[in-house]
Amino acid sequence: MNGNDNLSTRAYLAIGMMLFALFFGAGNLIFPAALGQQAGSNVGWALFGFVLTGVGLPLLGVAAMGYSSCKDVEELASRVHPIYGLLYTISLYLSIGPMFATPRTGTVAYEIAIKPFTEGLSMNMEPIFLALFFGVSLWLSISPHKLVNRIGNILTPALLLVILLLIIKSFMTPLVGYAVPQPAYGDAPTAVLQGFLDGYNTMDALASVVFAILVIDFVRLSGATSHAVVTKTVMEVGAIAVALLGIVYVFIANIGATSVERFGLFDTGAPVLSVSANYLFGGFGQIILAIIVLLACLSTSIGLITSCGTYFHKLTPKISYKLYVVIFSVAAFGLSMFGLKTIISAAIPVLMLLYPLTIVIVLLALLHNVFGGRRCVYAWTMAFTMISALMTGLETAGIAPATLEQLFTQYIPFQAAGMGWVSFAVLGFIVGLIHKGLVSENK
């Protein structure tokens, strides 16, 4: 460490690769592959939208946490109101924790890495594997201070090496041509929009504001002290992580886009990867893919359990961190038994609610100094965003009141596409600025 408390190159890379590995889990494997299959020859346009939410927003999330000087997500969200901050943060952690994202890591690991090797057995191996998977996740989550060494220095290099092998082979043995796009990706504008919404499924923007706290802690432990250096370093290691994510997304989506004519369409991205790896490498391909999936899903599972345990222990200190880790690991195991397709379907309405709220709070954090950090601007913007996001979530779940749904779809720009929250957020921001101006004039 030198005198101006900058990190060493090794520390930069270790923390950057740790963050990549925390992001790169179940959804980052299956959703680009599924997007590629659906988008076909429009995969480039769909990827553009997907990268905005799957790469751009996570980077903004990490940057916002570093820039804001907030010690956690709740403190940032409490700029709206303390009660909102608490409820939003609990919802966020439960979604990326035991309810959806963490169980998904186990189910994807089983579907891709284990199931192809056990299909001939009379015994159902899924419960046994999931118990082992979350047992290992629990064990490795007990000591969070060892996360950089275990993931950044060990798991991530191994993961990247095996992914690189798959990418090189996909160039040497290309699949057939690009498929005809499905209707949702039929032209460039719709493909970009659908890709943007598909990026919600990775949950990386939600996780970014959580993982950023881990990164900030590790940056400080590595020797950085001043706020300026911590912010700069967090953004740089975030850039390393999302650049790696973007590169991998491009190649996985391309494999999906060129796999349809040979293998047909699949319900999820899991079998796309499985049959493609088998085609590229033969029987050995399934082993390579199994290693990628196990490493990716395990590292993400550890990061999510660690983050959730840390937050809830802080919220209720009388319950130990280790007990919370046990609770979340057991809960994730139980919910993972419902299967991958059920978990994905159940998560979508919640994501349609939480994603707009997260995007807007991140943007407000980055614009904090522009409007003087006034609470009225935060409150009005988030209140308006909540109206549309809640309606979209209800629509996606199929429980929205028919009259309201018709009104929103007819009069709110992009509401039918799940993007009506943009208009509401802008309107709320303007109202907040007017409120700020009126209050200032009356002083």
Name each model-derived stretch.
Residues 13-24, 168-176, 185-252, 288-297, ...:
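Hydrophobic, membrane-embedded alpha-helices of multi-pass small-molecule transporters
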Residues 142-170, 348-359, 378-388:
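Membrane-interface loop-to-helix entry segments
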Residues 173, 374-443:
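A generic transmembrane alpha-helix motif of multi-pass inner-membrane proteins
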